[in-house]
């Protein structure tokens, strides 16, 4: 591999400058403002802020509604990640076996990733809308009382399916790349030894996909935490009865709807700490178990 050298020593810093500026403006500055606001409390008119130390954090952590949103977030994250990764792996395995029209099938499978989260949510809401949705009509015809606007479990199921559908395409790309990187000689050797399709997959293919699966687990966790706001906002608005109010959506409700900036900032700081701790734990303790030589 040819080594690239820069004759001008300042050029690398100019190339890094746009990314550094974007990171500072859109991450470090908002994060610092959130940390600052989490220790403050505004008056009823928003004219004066008072330093209240850890009162906002204490109020948040003792709030039953916040603890409920933590439970909702855990359920939503686990179900979304499992469904999105499971279906993507199934589709990638099937697409890897297709010979004719392989490019066409793969292109169709990655199109949903280009759909905006809010649009994806509206698509699923229209299909399962209890008043005019096609699938809602089929469910009622089969004796299922379908109404996600009133039933919390049905609402959770709908947003999980919509969020997973949006992420399947992303996972599919990486699983296909991982499958293509597996030497065919290993699979052929296992077939010669008498291992059937399912056994070959679980003993040869799946362990070699562990690094890819770990990477996607981290990505899907972060996705479910932050990038599903548009879906929840479009489909359920956090309802019914806060059944789909995740941590991110509660930050929005408390900060932009109820205008409780101190509590909202404290929640965002806690959420940021949770994601950082969870990601660090995954890389520190899980990553060691997924690499094969």
UniProtKB/Swiss-Prot annotation:
GO terms for cellular component: plasma membrane. The complex is composed of two ATP-binding proteins (UgpC), two transmembrane proteins (UgpA and UgpE) and a solute-binding protein (UgpB). GO terms for biological process: transmembrane transport. Belongs to the binding-protein-dependent transport system permease family. It holds the Pfam family BPD_transp_1. The keyword Cell inner membrane applies. NCBIfam families: PRK10561.1. Residues 66-282 form the ABC transmembrane type-1 domain. InterPro entries: MetI-like, MetI-like_sf, UgpAE/MalFG_permease. Disulfide bonds: none annotated. The keyword Hydrolase does not apply. This is sn-glycerol-3-phosphate transport system permease protein UgpA. It is a multi-pass membrane protein. Keywords: Cell inner membrane, Cell membrane, Membrane, Transmembrane, Transmembrane helix, Transport. It comes from Brucella suis biovar 1 (strain 1330). The chain crosses the membrane at residues 10-30, 72-92, 108-128, 155-177, 204-224, 261-281. Part of the ABC transporter complex UgpBAEC involved in sn-glycerol-3-phosphate (G3P) import. Probably responsible for the translocation of the substrate across the membrane. PROSITE patterns: ABC_TM1. PANTHER family: BLL4140 PROTEIN, SN-GLYCEROL-3-PHOSPHATE TRANSPORT SYSTEM PERMEASE PROTEIN UGPA. It comes from the Bacteria. It is found in: Cell inner membrane.
């Amino acid at each position: 591999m040819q080594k690239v050298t820069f004759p001008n020593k300042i050029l690398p810093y100019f190339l890094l400058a746009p990314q550094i500026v974007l990171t500072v403006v859109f991450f470090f500055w908002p994060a610092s403002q959130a940390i600052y606001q989490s220790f403050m409390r505004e008056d009823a008119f928003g004219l004066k802020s008072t330093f209240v130390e850890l009162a906002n954090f204490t109020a948040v952590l003792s709030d039953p509604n916040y603890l409920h949103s933590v439970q909702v977030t855990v359920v939503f994250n686990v179900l979304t990640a499992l469904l999105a990764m499971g279906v993507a792996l199934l589709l990638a395995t099937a697409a890897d076996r297709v010979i004719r029209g392989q490019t066409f099938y793969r292109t169709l499978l990655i199109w949903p990733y280009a759909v905006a989260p809010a649009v994806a949510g509206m698509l699923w809401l229209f299909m399962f809308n209890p008043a005019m949705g096609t699938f809602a009509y089929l469910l009622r015809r089969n004796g299922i009382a379908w109404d996600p606007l009133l039933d919390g479990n049905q609402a959770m199921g709908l947003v999980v399916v919509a969020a997973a559908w949006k992420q399947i395409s992303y996972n599919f790309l990486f699983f296909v790349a991982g499958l293509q990187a597996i030497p065919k000689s290993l699979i052929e050797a296992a077939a010669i030894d008498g291992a059937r399709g399912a056994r070959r997959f679980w003993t040869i293919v799946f362990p070699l996909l562990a690094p890819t699966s770990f990477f996607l687990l981290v990505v899907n966790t972060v996705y479910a935490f932050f990038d599903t706001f548009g879906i929840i906002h479009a489909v359920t608005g956090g309802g019914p009865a806060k059944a789909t109010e995740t941590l991110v959506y509660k930050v929005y409700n408390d900060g932009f709807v109820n205008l409780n900036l101190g509590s909202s900032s404290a929640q965002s700081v806690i959420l940021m700490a949770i994601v950082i701790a969870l990601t660090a734990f995954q890389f520190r303790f899980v990553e060691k178990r997924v690499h094969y030589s």
